[in-house]
Each structure stands twice: as C-alpha cells, then as structure tokens.
Amino acid sequence: TGFFWDERTFWHGGGNYAFTLPVGGLIQPMAAGGLPESPETKRRLVNLMQVTGLMGELDVRTASEAPTEALLRVHPQSYLDTFKKMSDNGGGELGLRVPFARGGYELAALSAGLSMAAVEAVLTGDVQNAYALSRPPGHHCLPDYPNGFCLMANIAIAIEAAKAKGLAGRVAVLDWDVHHGNGTEAIFYDRDDVLTISFHQEGNYPLDTGALADRGKGAGEGYNINLPLPAGAGHT
C-alpha cells in the first residue's frame, strides 16, 4: 500500500481571513487549525500511524507539484493565472469559501500532484493500492470556480493525467463525504468514460446540488449517481 503525503500541504491556511471574512475591525485572524478544513486532523492521523507502527508497514512517498500541463486539462489558463497572481501577492478569497495565504497556488498544485502520483503508482503496478493524504481538498472545485475550501480539482486532474499517459480508460469515482462532490460531478457530467458516484448528506453542502435525479447529460446520461442520505443516517 502506497501512502502519499507531504508535510507542506498541512501548511495551507486561510491567510488574512477569519473563516471567510476579511480580517479587520472586529474580525480577528484565526490560525490555519481553526479552519473547518483543518490540517490538525490530518497531522493527527500521521502521528497515530507513526506511533502505532503502521507507517512502517506502508510504502511512504511524496510527490512533486502537478505541472501546469496537467492542471490545464481541467482548469482554464485564466483561472490558473488569477490564482497564481493572488497567491504571489499574499493570497485572498478566490471564490466561495476558499480563503488562502501566500503560496497557496503551489500547495494546491502539490496536493494535486500527490493524487496524481498515487493514481499512477497503482495503475503502473508499482503498488497494489494507495492513499493520498493531502490538502487543500478538491471535490468542490469547478474548472473555473473554486468553493468549499477546494482550490484545484485533485481527482479530476489525476484522472486526466492517467488518461493522457494511456494508463486508464473507463474510470469510476466513489466520493464518500458528508458534502456532495459537486465539482467532480460537474467536470464529468456529460462524459461516459468516467462514472461519478457520491454518497453525501442530503441538503448539506452545496445546498442546490447532489439530487438523486441528477444523472448526467448527453453522453454522460446515467454516468452520474447521487445517493443523498438523511441527516443522522447510521451504518445499516
């Protein structure tokens, strides 16, 4: 089992924002650990894996930043240019609930790179299976509009990279999260080579996506499956 991670992705923070509000006046800055999408839970997982000895049973690896060529298969140049410019000039709020600090572009590209490396390692037979522990996350990010703390569409970038190398044909994405994977859904909504399946809490986030009736369109009709669950649903 390959375990792909990089401490630097845990340094991603909200910059000069408190949650999604600009700091100033009565708005006090908050640490990265105070964000709803916090690095501390991920760092805690790594620590537990180390002290229990589990880390020694894994093939631990890191990765490079996803190259621009890979990012452009999902995100338009205009989006990447805007993101990079803001990142180089101290960060800011790029979309809906996506504050980031200086260097956020490079950390998002590194997060995407970890996903790319994990997928490629499995498809080439280098490892049997893999897990990429990285942030910022990606399943809410649309090609030209980030939201929900997601700045780049990590899994879509990884899928397109694998396809470009001839490593993957038909792909299934299983998104298990309290939130609907609206970004991943939108990217592949009209395609029949990628099946997207999302388990999520009904009516959570985003409020207007994730309906059972949303099944794809055109060639992608039937290749998008939403399984919204009621709040409080258990394991049975």
Residue ranges and their predicted role:
Residues T1-T236:
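HDAC/HDAC-like amidohydrolase catalytic core signature
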